[in-house]
């Protein structure tokens, strides 16, 4: 599914738009951690609670290392990540054929 990543600041993207064939209006939102250790601590806690939906991985577009988890809303996930790429006016748009350099394996309902 093609996605369009838009930004209004130095982050690679602030919002992404895509026509997924699912009833969700918002797929997920991201919380940015201060350290990679914060990501690890959050992963351990959410894994122990059985909330992980996608394992650790690194996105192709913004290079964020993150994982996904269920929220109290059945329709929205949270991405918890660290280390996103920043861009400026010299940034050139790049097309990617996959969402992750590594990881982000879906484990919904398996943990």
Model region roles, listed by residue range:
Residues 13-15, 59:
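Aromatic/pi-system hotspot detector in well-structured domains
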Residues 1-13, 44:
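Core segments of cupin and vicinal oxygen chelate
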């Amino acid at each position: 599914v093609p996605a369009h990543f838009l930004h209004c600041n130095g982050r690679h993207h602030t919002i992404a738009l895509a026509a997924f064939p699912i009833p969700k209006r918002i797929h997920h939102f991201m919380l940015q951690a201060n350290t990679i250790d914060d990501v690890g601590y959050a992963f351990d806690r959410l894994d122990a609670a059985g909330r992980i939906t996608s394992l650790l991985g690194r996105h192709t577009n913004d290079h964020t290392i993150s994982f996904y988890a269920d929220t109290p809303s059945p329709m929205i996930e949270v991405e918890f990540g660290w280390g996103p790429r920043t861009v400026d006016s010299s940034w050139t748009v790049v097309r990617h054929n996959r969402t992750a350099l590594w990881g982000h394996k879906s484990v919904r309902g398996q943990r």
